[in-house]
Amino acid sequence: YVHAQDRLFQMDLARRQASGRLSEVVGEAGLENDKKFLVFSLRKAAEESYKDYSDEAKKILENYAQGVNSFIEEAKRDNKLPYEFSLLGYSPENWTPIDSLTVGKYMAYDLGGHWDHLGFNNWILNNLGEENLKQLLPDSFSKNKDNEEIIKANQGIDVSIR
């Protein structure tokens, strides 16, 4: 309840962003983001992982969702939804345990520093070679004067791109 009371709009945007549904409320500006997160399938991963949670953990997630939904119902009833919902012209949907897990997976992605491209670059280097890496990703090399040293340091490092 209290989390929603203080952060409902941010929670809703995080849920939408992680689920690939941001464009539903911000329009075309959210389409590229939606495409990316639909490919990442964080929501599907949350749905799959939920099956493996203990009954106790599921109950905690359900209680949390119930608290969020209590605030949503109260705020709708009393016309006290955060003003951002009015600005964008929509009301929040009820919260689910899957929403919590999806946002958690999004936070792990977001706080992880988006290192996925570095792993991919390293994979190209070690599987296709330095010249192919420079041809495939020329912009990466024109910006950093230390690239030759970085390439040498990264050669032979085993990296998975999955």
Per-region residue spans from a language model:
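Substrate-recognition/specificity elements adjacent to catalytic centers across diverse enzyme folds
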Residues: 1-162
